[in-house]
Amino acid sequence: TGAHSFELGEGPVWNPVTKQLSTVDIFHRRVHLFDLENSTPIHRSSFDTEGDVGAALPLLGGEFVLCENKEIVIRYPDGTREKITDVPLQGKNLRSNDAKIGPDGALWVGVMDYDAVDGAGSLWRVSRSGDCQKLLSNLTIPNGLDWWGNEFWFVDGPVEEIRCYNFGYSGLEATDRRFTTNGTPDGLTFDANGEIWLALWGQARVDHFNKHGEVVDSVEVASPHSTSLCFAGDDLNILVCTSALFAMDEATMGQYPNRGDIFSVDLGVSGRPANSIFT
């Protein structure tokens, strides 16, 4: 099922406290909130941001961590804002992209050039106190990221692989583990069994990888640019996928009346709750 249309929808997160799903529309500078009714996202409200918003991550107290260009901000329920820091970027044409709060309590945020310049991107870890640590450099489109145990799995869009790193408080260590993707990888999430679900930009589908890197299932999406994923609902059994109108020609738009929508499906698989404590 599809509902609501985004230019560049990204970053779906389920909040088990408010029982709402949040997403961002990056270039429209807006955060959208949805209820789930019979597994379908129903739009309830939205609020504007002050910059292009790569991610809006809900915290337990009702706040959101906003990644606006290079600025990291906490937005409180009454609408007031607290600036945490500016990510110390080199270059002016950069913006935040995908981000999540890690199991270490820090914000992990990817940064890219607006024109997707090769090697201009990076991945950062940001603490609540504003400390910034660069984890990876020479990226192009830092996209999906998630953790399983002491493993960090990550994609850089033009590199058609999901790569595994060992992570600790000192940083990341590359491993030999990597899964090949059939298409441009975008957002990803682990399910409760430790298997990866990956949105594929330009492929109108989501692929399910087992622990050996084999694609064991694919889900068609009625929008070619599927962008990001999460599991939602009381039992975390509803897979939600955002999508985008961005970079789509008129002929393709005509073939996909639900282009840019947000989609949901019950696949009989459960996910895990998002990290929601920012330290």
Language model segments and positions:
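A short loop-to-beta-strand structural motif that recurs across blades of beta-propeller domains
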Residues: 30-32, 71-73, 121-124, 161-163, ...
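Blade-level signature of beta-propeller repeat domains, shared across WD40, Kelch, NHL, RCC1
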Residues: 230-279
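Beta-rich, blade/repeat-based domains predominating
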Residues: 3-18, 48-64, 89-106, 135-152, ...
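Hydrophobic alpha-helical segments and helix pairs
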Residues: 79-135
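A short beta-strand motif characteristic of beta-propeller blades
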Residues: 1-3, 40-47, 82-89, 131-137, ...
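Flexible "stalk/tail and boundary" regions
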Residues: 36, 60-62, 76-77, 124-131, ...
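Short loop/turn segments immediately following beta-strands, especially the blade-tip
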Residues: 37, 165-171, 267-272
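Conserved beta-strand positions in repeat-built beta-propeller and related beta-rich domains
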Residues: 14-16, 21-27, 59, 64-70, ...
